[in-house]
Amino acid sequence: TVVNEMIAAKTTHRIGGVIRSGQTIDLMGDVLFLGDLHSGATLCASGNIFVMGQVGGVVQAGSQGDARAVVVGDLKGAGQIRIADVVEIVADHYDPDRPVAYLNELHTMTHAGLADLASIRPRLFKQMEAM
């Protein structure tokens, strides 16, 4: 039902462990992932993704078209970062001081520091403060 979909979209899932090559985790809502995402694995969420661990596979936020979604974490080993319909191949020049991936007003993948999250996505930052 529509109500169940709305509730699921506002849920924050907390998952941990290892997502192995060939596995795909696809969730509605935001995801806090504590673990390792191996090369060839995919972590997909309709909302934001926050990763605390090693990333070697594909991280996809905003999978239902939410261009306001962000991906936060150490993404230097990620194969791809996807937000909505935009895909970025993580290059060798990844900057660990800019762990926030988001789409800017030109619908281009951009990276920023954690301190910038409040100005980039103020609503998200206020939701995090309320937790």
Positions of the model-derived regions?
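Charge-rich, low-hydrophobicity low-complexity segments
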Residues: 1-40, 44, 54-131
